[in-house]
């Protein structure tokens, strides 16, 4: 039996022995539980004390991390080893925010001069757009920028742009991703072609959704302003210079990145150009600096003080040992409304795998379902299930100590109170006796209280972690995203899978390409299953009616 299998067995045995672990009792018995079960990086604090873990649990998690080689794999990533084994690629998104004075060597070459050159080009272009020195074909300054991309070319920049809204002092930003024509139609109808710039974000310049939307945008500009205006109203983030040129975009407006940057890790690269246009190069650098600090923390801090390590170990405990199928991410910040969707891609596309990096079937459950909404909205939507449902779903709360609206401090105080109350309620719950006593205190009869009390019981003992930081600024957002990137890495190492490929998205794309001529009526559906053929026929009938 391998060291990994032994460590896994020990954790499972420990879970069987501690299934009656009670968080209420744990806090009652240990007044120092919070200080012992939390870790911090400057003002950013991770509290995992409301999870059913003990010192013994953490020691056993350390053993499986050692057996899985988490530390060794971490060093391989930072050292540019080709840990993306299915694509034979290094994984170097950390180089995008690395201090440029420290070389990052890949195949004998320092990648940092290229990284800095792209950042400098982005800065020059974004400042030109922001200041109005780079103008539209009409001679006017750009007032609106539309980023056209999908997946990592959309989710990250869209999330960060909204999150950093208080720092916007550039043109308005818009994001179009879905191939559904409604998305680009509804975006364009509110814009003036005279003052609209488009950024086409596609590494290969072949992504079908992106290029379909890009073609529509080009036609819109050509129709309104003439074909010669296209070059002035478009920029691209791509490595396919020939395809970009054929589209009508000059090479001076093309910003590249590298095959060692995965899409869902790419907002630090030229994919982040719309973020830089919104908040400016200086704030974008602060964003990178925050991530770089978390990188150093992840690499240098001891396990118990290491935020990504602890978040990953707790995540593994919940998913594999406790068997919880999902986790809810609840940022108590309306400007982080897109963060759950961003983390959904980061986590589920990375760790939704069933084969180890050695090509064998996994022996443990892998990535959980990740979902969420901002608080307090979620409290009035799905918290019912979190508190009283039959499935236990760990919750990850995050909250800033200070908001951006000092004149509305009472709003933020209420937001904080709700966040902390939900965390406390999940942990404490309410017993049948407490529920009945509360009803009796309200003047209800004994019989009525007996009837209603079971409905007002909260089982409690439901795990949550809370992340607190002073304020959501570019530096803090950089730290927060890097924290979750490295958490996903830790869990992938514990699952023994490759977090950096995404073959699961390919089959559907291949079949969509085959089905398009069938949907268009250019081919029949012969050879397809009866369900797909029947659905095509029904759609055709509805179109003809």
Swiss-Prot record:
Organism lineage string: Bacteria, Pseudomonadati, Pseudomonadota, Alphaproteobacteria, Hyphomicrobiales
GO CC list: cytosol
Free-text function comment from the UniProt entry: Catalyzes the reversible isomerization of glucose-6-phosphate to fructose-6-phosphate.
Record's catalysed reaction(s): alpha-D-glucose 6-phosphate = beta-D-fructose 6-phosphate
Annotated active site: 349 (proton donor), 380, 509
GO MF: carbohydrate derivative binding; glucose-6-phosphate isomerase activity; monosaccharide binding
Protein name, per record: Glucose-6-phosphate isomerase
EC number: 5.3.1.9
This protein's record includes keyword Cytoplasm: yes
Superkingdom per UniProt: Bacteria
Family membership noted in the UniProt record: Belongs to the GPI family.
Subcellular location(s) per record: Cytoplasm
Gene name per UniProt: pgi
